[in-house]
Structures are given as structure tokens and as C-alpha cells.
Amino acid sequence: MSNQEKKMHEEELQQQETVEADTEAEAEAVGTDADIEWNEESALDETEAKIAQLEAALLSSEAKVKEQQDAVLRAKAEVENMRRRTEQEIDKARKFALNKFAEELLPIIDNLERAIQAADTESEVVQPILEGITLTHKTFIDTISKFGLKEINPEGEAFNPELHQAMSIQESADHESNTVMFVMQKGYELNGRVIRPAMVMVAK
């Protein structure tokens, strides 16, 4: 083989090596680009997963906050209801603490009124006594009325079963039907609660 042929052969080998090197470089470049693209997709997937986790955690936190807010509102409502009930019970106890005591006073009032009605107003001897009893009765009524005790004296009024107790029913040309003709015994109420109904005669 001549020198010229050797030289040409070497040049061909060099060209072939250069082509192979370029091919390998291109292959490596393509591989690198694929790796970069894969890494980017992997990072994106990981980011989206973290975002999803954060969103789920946020929703869970919001739900817990809502539950706690509802619990606080319920607790406040229960406290308010308890406070209102307590105030009502205290007010009720205050109003009706004298209920039993007032019931015990009613016979005394009845006896004073019977004494006034039975007294001989024409007698000079009885007159001073009657005045004393009348004054005592008035003072007594004025005093107990300050504590919410009120008499029920419904003569001439329509019969009310919540306030009156019908002891007798009679026909009457002078009264409308279901009207109280006569009060046999006055009734009393304490702060709006009947402690004794009025005993009455009702027109038929």
C-alpha cells in the first residue's frame, strides 16, 4: 500500500470516528433532554401532590374551625338559656315566696270583713270598735297589696272559671246568663296567680 493510500485510509478512519463521536454526542444530548423533561414532570407531579395535600389540610382545618365555632355558639346559647331560666326561677321564687304566708292571712281578712258586716252600725258602743276594725282592715289590705296580693270580687262580672268557683247556679231576671250574681267569699291572687278562687253564685 502506497503512502498516499495509507493517508487516505487514515483520513477515512478519522472521518468515521468523527461521525461516530458526533452521533454519540447527539444521543447523549437527546438523553439529557429526556432526563430534563422527565425530571420536570416528576417535580411538577410532586408539586401538585403537595398542593393537593395542603388543600386537603386546609379543608380539614376549616371544618374543624367551623365545628369549634358551632360548639362555642351552642355553649353560649346554653349559658344564655341557663341564665334566663335562673332569672325566671329567681323572679318566680321572689314573687311567690309569700304564697303560703298569704294563704294563712286570708282567714284573718275574712274574719275582719265578717265582723264589719255583722256590726250594729246604729250602736254608739259598737261604733268606735267598728271604726277600729275598719281601719285595721284597710291598713291590713293596703299592706299586703304592696306585696302583690289582690282581692277577686267579681259581683256583676261574667263568670270566669279560672278566677271563680261556682257554688250555686240560679235563674235571675235581673242578671244576664253566666253573670256573677253574688259573691259568697272573695278570692285572692298573688302576683297574678290565684291562691283562692272567689266563691260565687252564677245567674242561669
From Swiss-Prot:
Residues 1-12 have a biased composition (Basic and acidic residues). The keyword 4Fe-4S does not apply. PROSITE patterns: GRPE (PS01071). Its main location: cytoplasm. Keywords: Chaperone, Cytoplasm, Stress response. Belongs to the GrpE family. This is Protein GrpE. The gene is grpE.
